[in-house]
């Protein structure tokens, strides 16, 4: 692992010297141990973390990746790898043992290429998704698309391991990823899900090219596993001295055990995998089974040392753990490199095969630095000020700090942070790359930014510097131990001391007897300010004894003369001032004479007389004057060996005797809090025979042992110890008797203080006795549980506690007020911890009970009580039933049911013989609820029972009355139904007779002189066919092309035009686009239409493309169902075929089919308008479609009008006939009458009137009076619910021969009115159909309308248009002059040839292909959409009728025989008799085309060339090319990848890249 170190940011210029108050405030503001550290929390457990040198911190949790700023206070961006946009976490099998990282979706998180010249930083992420995919993204923002990605790079199993490192190698300095992963796991359910390709099944280490698009594996880029190697769990990957190292250990994922020793694999830092060997790592010292699990790894590069955390534990829980379970071991990299021989133990290469017995050499750690601990999880190492600093994470949420000595000797770790929740620390610790005083601590779902030292805990300069913490130093201006960055002007060496200075350089005030006549007060240390002041003051009298100023660059000194008057000075205050800060000290001379040692005497400011060996007042003299000047000159005392400290090792007979006599059995408790324990009991034998008994506690191997004297030997088998406070850890315990060997007791765990998370229930009754449960952790170290009440004080409560649970009975507070709150407290040693609040409320109130007996051997007792908030459980309640004189039965609690008013408690008494007797006897019920005991009164008979007696009598009376009323109503209903049936029969007879008569007698006079057929020009015909649903393209494609310069086409479009004329390229692009999931059916149709327009003048080339794509489509369909080919428009070629047919058949459509088609539409319109048409719904009496049948029609009649047209400037011709007779219906609205009048004018004069419908009005001429006719006016009928009925001719009572004047409106014109649901015409609202809206003679008419009565109208309409329809059909499937259109003949021959090539012998297949390509794909589209061909407006009703005609047309081409019954839809039945005739004609049509002589290629090319010339400059081809490029650039990477894989398209690939450059430059120019 490579750790970058940045220089500290430039500091601001030095300000003026701050005041002492400011220095004090700065000291308060500096962060301390208790400050809240910033925490970032995720939704799921964190699986990976990395810090970038410039772009913040990256954290992977579940399926999410977050980018945070360095302070963890702001989230910069987030990436969701789950398609649903959730941060899900893996649902793994049984949770793995804690010494190993658990399941995670994230496998790699590697920032790289940071700071490279001219290159931006990148982030490589590896996930289990998509078979172990890796992505490369820019470091700046995760939301940007990935630059490169590849599959099968990392392990795709959430439990599997992955380690990797990115480096540069080769001549071109390309970036490579060396990755080691557990690609295959033994679990069958996961193996089938995401195993890699067979060639990668035994891959252990792979080399990937990160600059390739798919992160492809190098040709020599795999290192394989030996057959018997099993699964390897890789922990880390790092670079050192030109090699890549992978620490790992063999691991059985099924059993959860390590199957071999941890090892280190080594490969060369090269462009291919060059295996350089492996070496085993032995960190098993101090553990009987060895430590075979490798938990964490860190390379201390500056020291060329690798640190690892090893573990022997294989399961969860303290019962599987011991004080020696884990260890920190340091290995010299040079030794690992020397011993990593190329043995084939776990890995095989091409040169060497796996050999049994060829074991790797074992490397031993640096013994002095090995640190043994009970529960380490992670390590990170670095070098600060030439000191090696190691940070260690633990399983109980601690962050430890170890500082190695000169010989790499580990000191006792310092706890620099503890997680309150005790979450295990993540296996990877990450330093802050910007500020090296921080480290990121990850645990569970949280990341914290922690300061790397607690400098402020050192209160003095000497304490600060003797702690040897390289992060800390003494700040003179603040008089505190701080980080250098927290000290003002720390760059000034006079203001800052680090550990290299040593404690001797700390500033210190000393009082020295310089001579017999005077005493000197001075300051020693490394501090030499330019100017200083000093002053000595008598504290008792506030008198100054001395005051002085220093000479430049010299320390101030104060001389006090030796006077008899100064003997009474007991306390002096000495102060040195240095401009911005002061140094002061107080000396007390009261006890000088009591001090017996020279160092202690001189330290307090007293004077030591050498010859007399006594301590005196400093302002008096020795006799003779033989005092020591300072502490350094005191004689060195020889230390005596004390009884404490380390236990003596006595190997004499006493030891052997102790081993034979004394016996240790157990220690209780085995867990104590960090506060210690005053009564720990050790059990065994023969304790009273020993005189000196000590307990020795040994925790972390590099820390001092605790030696504790026995407190009290209780008897021969029990003794008591009082344990001191300690940090959280597990310790070995042994007992030493009389200086003999230490007998092991086992282990003892120091754990954190208890923590409460829940009290349930939180409300109880005042009498107490309810079972209360507390949830939390570390409850097994509680001494007492106390209820604290404001009146009753502290109440000790009996409790039962385990680690996470504590139960107790709520005490009674009966004498207190009814509603009160108490505090639950936990006592640990002499410390009280608040656990929460317990609410007391008044006792429950019981209202009664009842006893029921459904079975003779069982009684049910139901007790009612008032509703309350007590959560009563089965353990809280006891119910007893007393019956007879002495009978007593216990009732078993069943459940409690809470109702709206009362709560019911149900209990049952089972196994009795006389249940019914007991239920009817005298009885009472006793309820004991905790401490509450009471008798419940039996429920009284409610008054409702009397009501239940009267109820049956009333019920009988009501029933008889109801029967009488019902019979009367039934008779009335039968009479009305008979009348209605008679009326309905009469109506049916009339309608059937009228329908029959109309069918036989009706005749439609088709107007043949319909004038010129209003054909659309080719341009609009083509666009409506190409884009039936996209009207927005009409304008951009039809701009004036004649004024455009042909040479004006820009270079990018010219290049693209040339590129799509490359057939292989274009076909490849189309196939690639169709494989994209988000390339929808709409996109395919649009792309085909854009391509048709772009190649409109290159129809020969377009036809060749159509041929290739059709053949490819045949290849796809021939393997599945060939009859389905071309049936739907789901591919580009199908829409392309539609467009091609439209282009090639446009002339045939205009010359042959257009006129009969227009005649059909006109005839159909005439027939529809002959009968009533509802304006609102567009339904009509005469129709071909049952869904559009107006069967709610009233009686109607024809009204002949004499219409007079006003002379207008738009139509002043003298030849125009202005008096016209027009027939309308009395049920027509005024708007419908206008349309018929306009149509009559057009038919009479051959030209339109000159105005639009909304520009004219109608006036009824009544003598000298006129009345304007409107659809809605003041006389309109308003129905219920505010619905307005539109005015009709009948509404105005206009009779035959009435004169109507057509005039031009003067007011502003309005567009055609779209009537809302608030209006109606012929179809009335349901509630109105029962009312008489047209007079009494029509009463009830609407009520009995039946749809089937009017089905003959469908047949009548069919007969009216039949001859016109057949003329149209035969114009389509006939061959004028015995010649088929070129396009049809060519494509049908093409289909015949392809069928023959593919050996398709079924003639039905070819018939279906032809039907799908011509009638279905072209003619049906035209028949249903006349507005594609003519300049007319298609109404919804016409659309419904044309759908029936189009269906009949397609049925004529179908090969299946129609099996129609009486229940078949009318749309099918209408042309059922005609279809067989049509089918025969179609077969003859197909045969005639096939029998025609084939077209030569030159004929077809000539035809296509002529068609191309016809349509030159019809469309704006540049727009089409631009739209095509949008699709190409959207899927640019996919197209480019496809071109790379296809042979022969290298030139096309270059052209495509050139086109993209041209378009990109054009885009840049637009912004300039």
UniProtKB/Swiss-Prot annotation:
It is a single-pass type I membrane protein. Gene3D superfamilies: GTPase Activation - p120gap, domain 1 (1.10.506.10), Immunoglobulins (2.60.40.10), ligand-binding face of the semaphorins, domain 2 (3.30.1680.10), Phosphatidylinositol 3-kinase Catalytic Subunit, Chain A, domain 1 (3.10.20.90), YVTN repeat-like/Quinoprotein amine dehydrogenase (2.130.10.10). GO terms for cellular component: cerebellar climbing fiber to Purkinje cell synapse; membrane; plasma membrane; semaphorin receptor complex. It comes from the Eukaryota. Disulfide bonds join 64-87, 156-194, 226-354, 283-329, 455-472, 461-506, 464-481, 475-487. N-glycosylated. SMART domains: IPT, PSI, Sema. The modification Phosphoserine is found at residue 978. Residues 35-944 are extracellular. Residues 1-34 form the signal peptide. Residues 35-452 form the Sema domain. It holds the Pfam family PSI. Residues 966-1568 are cytoplasmic. Glycans are attached at residues 86, 141, 149, 241, 252, 386, 407, 548, 582, 653, 692, 771, 796, 821, 871, 890. Receptor for SEMA7A, for smallpox semaphorin A39R, vaccinia virus semaphorin A39R and for herpesvirus Sema protein. Binding of semaphorins triggers cellular responses leading to the rearrangement of the cytoskeleton and to secretion of IL6 and IL8. Belongs to the plexin family. This is Plexin-C1. It comes from Homo sapiens.
């Amino acid at each position: 692992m490579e750790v970058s170190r940045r220089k500290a940011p430039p500091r601001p210029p030095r300000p003026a010297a701050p005041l002492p108050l400011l220095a004090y405030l700065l000291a308060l503001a500096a962060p301390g141990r208790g400050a809240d550290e910033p925490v970032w929390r995720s939704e799921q457990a964190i699986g990976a973390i990395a810090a970038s040198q410039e772009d913040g911190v990256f954290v992977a949790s579940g399926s999410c990746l977050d980018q945070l700023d360095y302070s963890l206070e702001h989230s910069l961006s987030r990436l969701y790898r789950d398609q649903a946009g959730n941060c899900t976490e893996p649902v793994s099998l049984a949770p793995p043992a804690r010494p190993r990282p658990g399941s995670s979706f994230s496998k790699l998180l590697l920032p790289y290429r940071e700071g490279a010249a001219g290159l931006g930083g990148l982030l490589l992420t590896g996930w289990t998704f998509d078979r172990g995919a890796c992505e490369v993204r820019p470091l700046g923002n995760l939301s940007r698309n990935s630059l490169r990605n590849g599959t099968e790079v990392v392990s795709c199993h959430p439990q599997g391991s992955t380690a990797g490192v990115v480096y540069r190698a080769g001549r071109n300095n390309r970036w490579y990823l060396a990755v080691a992963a557990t690609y295959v796991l033994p679990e069958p359910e996961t193996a089938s899900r995401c195993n890699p390709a067979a060639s990668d099944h035994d891959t252990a280490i792979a080399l990937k090219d990160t600059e390739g698009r798919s992160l492809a594996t190098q040709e020599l880029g795999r290192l394989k596993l030996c057959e018997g190697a099993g699964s390897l769990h890789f922990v880390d990957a790092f670079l050192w001295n030109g090699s890549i190292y992978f620490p790992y250990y063999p691991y059985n994922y099924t059993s959860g055990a390590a199957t071999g020793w941890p090892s280190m694999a080594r490969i060369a830092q090269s462009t291919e995998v060059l295996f350089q060997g492996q070496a085993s790592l032995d960190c098993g010292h101090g553990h009987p089974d060895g430590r075979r699990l490798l938990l964490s790894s860190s390379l201390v590069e500056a020291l060329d040392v690798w640190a690892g955390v090893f573990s022997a534990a294989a399961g969860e829980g303290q019962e599987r753990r011991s004080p020696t379970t884990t260890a920190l071991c340091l290995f010299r990299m040079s030794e690992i490199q020397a011993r990593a021989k190329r043995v084939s133990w776990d890995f095989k290469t091409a040169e060497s095969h796996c050999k049994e017995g060829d074991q790797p050499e074992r490397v031993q750690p640096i013994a002095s630095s090995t640190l043994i601990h009970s529960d380490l999880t992670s390590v990170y190492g670095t070098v600060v000020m030439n000191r090696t600093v190691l940070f260690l994470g633990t399983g109980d949420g601690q962050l430890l700090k170890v500082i190695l000595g000169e010989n790499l000797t580990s000191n006792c770790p310092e706890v620099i942070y503890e997680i309150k929740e005790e979450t295990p620390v993540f296996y990877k610790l990450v330093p802050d790359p910007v500020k090296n005083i921080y480290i990121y601590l990850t645990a569970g779902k949280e990341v914290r930014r922690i300061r790397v030292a607690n400098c402020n805990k050192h209160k003095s300069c000497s304490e600060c510097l003797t702690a040897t913490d390289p992060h800390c130093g003494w700040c003179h201006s603040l008089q505190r131990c701080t980080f250098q960055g927290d000290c003002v002007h720390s760059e000034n060496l006079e203001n800052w001391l680090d550990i290299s200075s040593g404690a001797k350089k700390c500033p210190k005030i000393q009082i020295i007897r310089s001579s017999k006549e005077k005493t000197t007060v001075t300051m020693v240390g490394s501090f030499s300010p330019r100017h200083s002041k000093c002053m000595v003051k008598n504290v008792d009298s506030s008198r100054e004894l001395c005051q002085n100023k220093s000479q430049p660059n010299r320390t101030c000194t104060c001389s006090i003369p030796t006077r008899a008057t100064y003997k009474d000075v007991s306390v002096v205050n000495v102060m040195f001032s240095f401009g911005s800060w002061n140094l002061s000290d107080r000396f007390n001379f009261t006890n000088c004479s009591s001090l017996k040692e020279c160092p202690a005497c001189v330290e307090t400011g007293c004077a030591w007389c050498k010859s007399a060996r006594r301590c005196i007042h400093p302002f008096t003299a020795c006799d003779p004057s033989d005092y020591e000047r300072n502490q350094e000159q005191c004689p060195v005392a020889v230390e005596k060996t004390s009884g404490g400290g380390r236990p003596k090792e006595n190997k004499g007979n006493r030891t052997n005797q102790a081993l034979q006599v004394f016996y240790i059995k157990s220690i209780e408790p085995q867990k104590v809090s960090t506060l210690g324990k005053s009564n720990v009991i050790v059990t065994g034998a023969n304790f009273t025979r020993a005189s000196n008994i000590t307990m020795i506690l040994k925790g972390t191997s590099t820390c001092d042992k605790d030696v504790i004297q026995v407190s009290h030997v209780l008897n021969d088998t029990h003794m008591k110890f009082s344990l001191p406070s300690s940090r959280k850890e597990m310790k070995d315990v042994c007992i030493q008797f009389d200086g003999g060997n230490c007998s092991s007791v086992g282990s003892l765990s120091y754990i954190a203080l208890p923590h409460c998370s829940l009290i349930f229930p939180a409300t109880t009754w005042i009498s107490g006795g309810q079972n209360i449960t507390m949830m939390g952790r570390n409850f097994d170290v509680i001494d007492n549980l106390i209820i604290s009440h404001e009146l009753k004080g502290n109440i000790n409560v009996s409790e039962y506690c385990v680690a996470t649970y504590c139960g107790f009975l709520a005490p009674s507070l009966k004498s207190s007020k009814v509603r009160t709150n108490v505090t639950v407290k936990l006592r640990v040693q002499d410390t009280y911890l608040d656990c929460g609040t317990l609410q007391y409320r008044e006792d429950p109130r019981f209202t009664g009970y009842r006893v029921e007996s459904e079975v003779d051997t069982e009684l049910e007792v139901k007790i009612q009580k008032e509703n309350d908030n007590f959560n009563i459980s089965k353990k809280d309640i006891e119910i007893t039933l007393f019956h007879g004189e002495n009978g007593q039965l216990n009732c078993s609690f069943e459940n409690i049911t809470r109702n709206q008013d009362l709560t019911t408690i149900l209990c049952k008494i089972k196994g009795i013989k006389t249940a019914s007797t007991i239920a009817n006897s005298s009885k009472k019920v006793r309820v004991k609820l905790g401490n509450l005991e009471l008798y419940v009164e039996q429920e009284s008979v409610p008054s409702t029972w009397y009501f239940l007696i009267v109820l049956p009598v009333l019920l009988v009376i009501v029933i008889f009355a109801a029967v009488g009323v019902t019979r009367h109503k039934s008779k009335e209903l039968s009479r009305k139904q008979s009348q209605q049936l008679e009326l309905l029969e009469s109506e049916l007879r009339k309608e059937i007779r009228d329908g029959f008569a109309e069918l036989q007698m009706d005749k439609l006079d088709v107007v043949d002189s319909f004038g010129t057929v209003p054909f659309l020009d080719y341009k609009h015909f083509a666009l409506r066919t190409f884009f039936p649903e996209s009207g927005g393209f009409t304008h951009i494609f039809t701009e004036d092309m004649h004024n455009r310069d042909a040479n004006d086409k820009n270079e990018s479009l010219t290049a693209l035009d040339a590129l799509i004329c490359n057939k292989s390229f274009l076909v490849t692009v189309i196939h690639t686009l169709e494989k994209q999931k988000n390339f929808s059916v709409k996109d395919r149709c649009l792309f085909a239409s854009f391509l048709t327009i772009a190649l409109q003048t290159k129809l020969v080339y377009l036809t060749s493309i159509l041929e290739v794509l059709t053949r490819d489509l045949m290849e796809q369909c021939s393997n599945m169902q060939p009859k389905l080919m071309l049936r739907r428009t789901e591919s580009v070629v199908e829409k392309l075929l539609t467009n091609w047919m439209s282009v090639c058949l446009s002339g045939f459509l205009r010359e042959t089919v257009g006129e009969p088609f227009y005649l059909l539409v006109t005839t159909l319109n005439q027939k529809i308008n002959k009968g009533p048409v509802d304006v609102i719904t567009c339904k009509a009496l005469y129709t071909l479609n049952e869904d559009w049948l107006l069967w709610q029609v009233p009686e109607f009649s024809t009204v002949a009008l004499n219409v007079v047209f006003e002379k207008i400037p738009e139509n002043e011709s003298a030849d125009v006939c202005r008096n016209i007779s027009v027939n309308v219906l009395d049920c027509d609205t005024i708007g419908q009458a206008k349309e018929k009048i306009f149509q009559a004018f057009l038919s009479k004069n051959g030209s339109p009137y000159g105005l639009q419908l909304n520009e004219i009005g109608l006036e009824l001429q009544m003598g000298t009076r006129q009345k304007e006719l409107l659809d809605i006016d003041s006389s309109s009928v308003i129905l219920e619910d505010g619905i307005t009925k539109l005015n009709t001719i009948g509404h105005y009572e206009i009779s035959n021969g009435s004169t109507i004047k057509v005039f031009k409106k003067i007011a502003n014109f309005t567009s055609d009115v779209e009537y809302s649901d608030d209006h109606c015409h012929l179809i009335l609202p349901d509630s109105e159909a029962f009312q008489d809206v047209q007079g009494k003679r029509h009463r009830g008419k609407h009520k009995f309308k039946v749809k089937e009565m009017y089905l003959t109208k469908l047949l009548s309409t069919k007969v009216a248009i039949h001859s016109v329809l057949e003329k149209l059909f035969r114009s389509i499937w006939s061959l004028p002059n015995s010649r088929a259109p070129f396009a049809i003949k060519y494509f049908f021959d093409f289909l015949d040839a392809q069928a023959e090539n593919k050996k398709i012998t079924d003639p039905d297949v070819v018939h279906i292909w032809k039907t799908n390509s011509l009638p279905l794909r072209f003619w049906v589209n035209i028949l249903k959409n006349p507005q594609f061909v003519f300049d007319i407006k298609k109404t919804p009703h016409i659309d419904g009728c044309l759908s029936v005609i189009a269906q009949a047309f397609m049925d004529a081409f179908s090969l299946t025989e129609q099996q129609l019954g009486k229940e078949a839809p009318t749309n099918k039945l209408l042309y059922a008799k005609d279809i067989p005739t049509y089918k025969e004609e179609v077969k003859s049509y197909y045969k005639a085309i096939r029998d025609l002589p084939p077209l030569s290629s030159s004929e077809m090319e000539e035809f296509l060339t002529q068609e191309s010339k016809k349509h030159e400059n019809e469309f704006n081809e540049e727009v089409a090319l631009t739209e095509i490029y949008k699709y190409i650039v959207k899927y640019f990477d996919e197209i480019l990848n496809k071109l790379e894989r296809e042979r022969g398209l290298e030139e096309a690939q270059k052209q495509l890249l050139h086109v993209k450059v041209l378009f990109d430059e054009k885009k840049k120019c637009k912004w300039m």
